[in-house]
Amino acid sequence: PGNALAQRLDHARRFATDHRIRIVSPDDFGLIDTLAFHFDEPFADASALPTFRVCELAREQVTVALSGDGADEAFAGYRRHRFQMQGERIRGLIPASVRQPLFGALGKYYPKADWAPRALRAKSTFLELAGEGGAAYAASVGVTPHALRHRLYDQDMKSRLGAYRAEDRYIKAMAEAPARDPLDRAQYADIRIWLPGDILTKTDRMSMAVSLEAREPLLDHRLVEFAARLPVNQRIRGNSGKYLLKKAMEPYLPQDILYRQKMGFVTPISAWFRGALAGEATAIAGGSSLARTGWFDPKALAKIAADHKSGMADHGRLLWQLLMLDKSLERLFGI
């Protein structure tokens, strides 16, 4: 977006850096085959696309680059970390005998408003508060809720999956964490699963795809171990994550940079799938590799694409997941 570009240019002027810009557009969608080739597995984080472009741009000038991965996981920088703390406070204040039926009923009858601003999408929040903390946090990490995934499968695949839930791996990691505080358990699971499985895999493969060596100074084990020993109020204070890390940088960075709202490295795939790439979304239910597996209900896939295009729901990230799976199946198995 234009305001983000203006901010970056302003930062470059402040610090006298040599700033270069590359804008990712729907035309870059053709890279999806390149991504499938380099990941060699169905890797579905859509930020892989701009990560590839950034690495490509950096490689024009250097052969080694520093990455900032790891700070959010070590110092509790994600919004879900704050939500986990707030949710646990509510669970601690309201007995389960009251909380579960109360929030369960609110979650059941509150309208599902995927089209609405995030602040108004309270249905999932109510359902998470009705449940226990580990399950709620695991759900917040995922892109597609279990119930929606289940609706996509055909009957045979549902039978084969049985009681399997992808979230159970996260719940198990939190339960086994050598910690008592809920935030510590959540961060432990992030470092064990999310960081190596998503963030570092993405950075490593996209950088090596262009022969760029990416190094991770914030993952020095001494820094991560130091962060793990910090009390919760040194990681999250008020509405700010990475509290101590930001305080340490106050002598060097202006307030408007340090304390601005967190901006993820996102790709506007939801808008793309309603515009230039709407045809790609519709094709998922037709003659794609995905359709030929027999794993999914074609009508359910078609409804996902139609609801997204009409604005009834935001399935942009799910559609990207499905397309990456489709491209990976085509590449790996020739389906």
Language-model regions, residue ranges each:
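Short low-complexity, flexible loop/linker segments enriched in glycine and/or proline
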Residues: T34-H38, R59, H81-F83, W272-R274
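Short, polar/flexible loop-turn hinges at active-site or ligand-entry regions and domain interfaces
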Residues: E41-A44, R89-L93, N233-R237
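Adenosyl-5′-phosphate
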Residues: S47, E60, V64-L66, P117-I335
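Acyl-group handling in specialized metabolite and lipid biosynthesis
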Residues: P1, R14, D18-I23, A44, ...
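Active-site adenylate/phosphate-handling loop in enzymes that bind or generate adenylated species
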Residues: R53-A113, R151, W194, I199, ...
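Adenylate-forming
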Residues: S47-R53
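A conserved beta-strand->alpha-helix junction
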Residues: P1-H38, V64, L161-R169
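Short beta-strand segments
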Residues: I21-I23, V54, L66-S67, M324
